[in-house]
Amino acid sequence: MLKQRTIKSIVKTVGIGVHSGRKIELTLRPAAPGTGIVFSRVDLPTPVDIPAAATSIGDTRLASVLQKDGVRVSTVEHLMSACAGLGIDNLYVDVTAEEIPIMDGSAATFVFLIQSAGIEEQNAPKRFVKVKKTVEIRDGDKFARLDPYFGFKLKFSIDFRHPAVDKTGQELEVDFANTSYVREIARARTFGFAHEAEMLREMGLARGGSMENAIVLDEYRILNNDGLRYDDEFVKHKMLDAIGDLYVIGHPLLASYTAYKSGHGLNNALLRELLANEDAYEIVTFDDPQAAPKGFAFDMQTAFA
C-alpha cells in the first residue's frame, strides 16, 4: 500500500519572526500515523496544540494563521508547503512564538530540515482528498478553483503591473507528475514592496523583514543584489504558498487547482467550500502504490521532489 510518512528523528533550528523580529526556536518531531501536522506553542505556561485544519485558519491578511482558543501560530504556509512537497503526513511542530520563523522567505530551509531528519514510512495507508466535483470561489476578478484530476497540478496567474514583475513569467502551470517540487518550487522567496514594508513597520509588523528573507522591490526594480533564483520566482512563490495553504485540509489533494490573483484568504475559502459539499470529494487510499498518480507512487525520499 501507499503509506503515510513522518520524519525519522527530531530536528531543530532557530530563525527570525518576520513580523516580531524576534528569535524563534523551531523543533520538528516524528508523529504517529493519523496524527496529521500539529503545531505546538511550547512557549506558553501550558503548551497548546493546534492541528493544521482548514477550519482552524483565522486571519489570512498577511499569512495563513492557525488559531485555537485565542492562541495563534502565524505564517505556517511555507512549512506546510514543504510537508506537502515531501509527502509528510504526520509531524509535531514545536514553536516558541506565535509565528513560524521566516528563514530565507522560501520553503528551502524546511525541505532541508525534513530531509536532514530523514523520512520514514509508517504502517498505515496514506489518505488523499479526491475532488469529485468542481468547486470555485470568486472575489471580484480574483478566483480559485478545484477540478477533478487524477494527480496534483496547479495553474496560477498573477497581475502585479510592476516593471520588474512584468519582465518575469506571470503565469505558471505545474503538474507534479513530471515536475520536481524541491528543484522547481521550494526555493522561490516571498516578495514585497519597500513602501509597503514601511507601512507595516509603522503598524508594528514586518520587523524581521529584510532582503535576507524576501525579494524587495521599489517602484521600478528589484533591490536585492543577487537578483532572482528563478526567472519566474514571483509566480512560483505564489504557487508555493498555495500548495501550503491547500495542505491544511489535512491530506494531499487529488485535484487540479487554477487561480488568478488568489491569496491565503481565497485559498482557505476554497477549502471550506469543498468541505461544505460532501458530494464534491471523497477520501481515498491506494493498496497498490503503482495505482496511485505518478508523483505520489514514490520509492524515493520525497513525494513530488
UniProtKB/Swiss-Prot annotation:
Protein name: UDP-3-O-acyl-N-acetylglucosamine deacetylase
The gene coding this protein: lpxC
BP term (GO), one: lipid A biosynthetic process
A GO cellular-component term linked to this record: membrane
Enzyme class of the recorded protein, top EC level: hydrolase
Keyword Zinc: yes
Catalyses which reaction(s): a UDP-3-O-[(3R)-3-hydroxyacyl]-N-acetyl-alpha-D-glucosamine + H2O = a UDP-3-O-[(3R)-3-hydroxyacyl]-alpha-D-glucosamine + acetate
Keyword entries, A-Z: Hydrolase, Lipid A biosynthesis, Lipid biosynthesis, Lipid metabolism, Metal-binding, Zinc
Residues noted as binding Zn(2+) in the record, renumbered to the chain: 78, 237, 241
Organism name: Burkholderia lata (strain ATCC 17760 / DSM 23089 / LMG 22485 / NCIMB 9086 / R18194 / 383)
SUPFAM superfamilies: Ribosomal protein S5 domain 2-like
Function field: Catalyzes the hydrolysis of UDP-3-O-myristoyl-N-acetylglucosamine to form UDP-3-O-myristoylglucosamine and acetate, the committed step in lipid A biosynthesis.
PANTHER family: UDP-3-O-ACYL-N-ACETYLGLUCOSAMINE DEACETYLASE 1, MITOCHONDRIAL-RELATED
The keyword Transmembrane helix is assigned to this record: no
